[in-house]
From Swiss-Prot:
Catalyzes the interconversion of methylthioribose-1-phosphate (MTR-1-P) into methylthioribulose-1-phosphate (MTRu-1-P). The gene is mtnA. It comes from Cronobacter sakazakii (strain ATCC BAA-894) (Enterobacter sakazakii). Belongs to the eIF-2B alpha/beta/delta subunits family. MtnA subfamily. Substrate binds at R49, G50, A51, R86, Q187, N238, K239. It comes from the Bacteria. It is an enzyme of class 5 (isomerase). GO terms for molecular function: S-methyl-5-thioribose-1-phosphate isomerase activity. This is Methylthioribose-1-phosphate isomerase. The lineage of its organism: Bacteria, Pseudomonadati, Pseudomonadota, Gammaproteobacteria, Enterobacterales.
Length: 339
């Protein structure tokens, strides 16, 4: 396979490398993903994360395994193991469905390689379309609030919600970005803050519980988030805490936008109640670990509830910005996502 580089993925000498997003921003470590077990481990540990990026990393690995001589049957088994790595992220399922089709071709090695590279290029292009469509909704002088991380670290391109902010900033329309730290794993504080700093976008980091106070003071003009899955009725699964922001935004009459690619749509999923929600380890809540080491603050026997995602009802969303354009609540009510 040709050499490939994104913010978080590399293919060099027919080997897949991932940027360890658990070590950022203090350390920039590239880790190998030589086999299915290694990549699944990286996904579970959130060293590679973001719904689009997870799908792309799995697709690239399958293509590389094929080039290294793995049989068709073994590749089919590897594909299903990868499919189970992150159940909420429908991009992974959609990408692997396309790779599964490529696997049926007579020259499956070439077909898998071509399809994986096509998926990367498509993601770059659709991120740009999302970013430009969304930036048109941003008013001059806007103070925007975002949650989790939805930029180049989570995609092959400029990103989804963070891509919108980046393009709006280039147009001179962003006065400030409020960055939720995004408990418990701090993707906002670690990753989004780092990306915005690299882009030169003015931002201020806040704890998740400060959003209500800012909205009450009129300090937030719009909220922009990404999505891991969008159901047929417009309900959105995204990083835990998104639902809270949507409720706050509705109460304070602040527009709440979701930016995501078409591949995040799941027409077969009728509503948010049907979306599987990943439950994660208690240690993520009882303490914190990073390049600085590990600290535990909760009692050893503390019981923990730690869902990775929550579901935001469509009724709380002002608009869905896809690579195909802006979808309104009226469009969704008329079955736009129902397939």
């Amino acid at each position: 396979m040709q050499t490939l580089q994104t913010t978080s993925l590399r293919v060099v000498d027919n080997k897949l490398w991932i940027l360890d997003q658990q070590a950022l921003p203090q350390q920039k470590n590239w880790l190998p993903a030589d086999n299915t077990e290694a990549l699944v481990g990286h996904i579970h540990a959130l060293r590679v994360r973001g719904a689009p990026l997870i799908g792309l990393s799995a697709s690239l690995l399958l293509a590389l395994l094929a080039e290294h001589g793995m049989t068709r049957d073994a590749l089919g088994q590897a594909l299903e193991v990868l499919r189970a790595a992150r159940p909420t992220a429908v991009n992974l399922m959609n990408n692997l469905d396309r790779m599964k089709q490529a696997l049926t071709q007579p020259d499956f090695v070439a077909a898998l390689g071509a399809e994986a590279l096509r998926l990367v290029q498509e993601d770059r292009e659709l991120c740009e379309r999302i970013a430009r469509a969304g930036s048109e909704l941003v008013k001059p002088g806007s103070r925007l609030l975002t949650h989790c991380n939805t930029g180049g670290l989570a995609t092959a391109g400029v990103g989804t919600a963070l891509g919108v902010i980046a393009r709006a900033h280039e147009a001179g329309k962003v006065a400030n970005v409020w960055v939720d730290e995004t408990r418990p794993l701090l993707q906002g504080g670690r990753l989004t803050a780092w990306e915005l700093g690299e882009l030169g976008v003015p931002y201020q980091l806040i704890t998740d519980s400060m959003a209500a106070s800012l909205m009450a003071q009129g300090q937030v003009d719009a909220v922009w988030v990404g999505a891991d899955r969008i159901a047929a009725n417009g309900d959105v699964a995204n990083k835990i805490g998104t639902y809270s922001l949507a409720v706050l935004a509705k109460f304070h009459n602040v527009p709440f936008y979701v930016a995501a690619p078409q591949t995040t749509l799941d027409p077969a999923c009728p509503n948010g109640a049907a979306i599987p929600i990943e439950q994660r380890a208690a240690a993520e809540v009882t303490g914190v670990a990073g390049s600085f080491g590990a600290v535990q603050w909760a009692p050893e026997d503390a019981r923990v509830y730690n869902p990775a995602f929550d579901v935001t009802p469509a009724a709380l969303i002002s608009g869905w910005v896809l690579d195909s354009g802006v979808v309104t609540p009226e469009d969704v009510a008329n079955g736009r996502f129902a397939g």
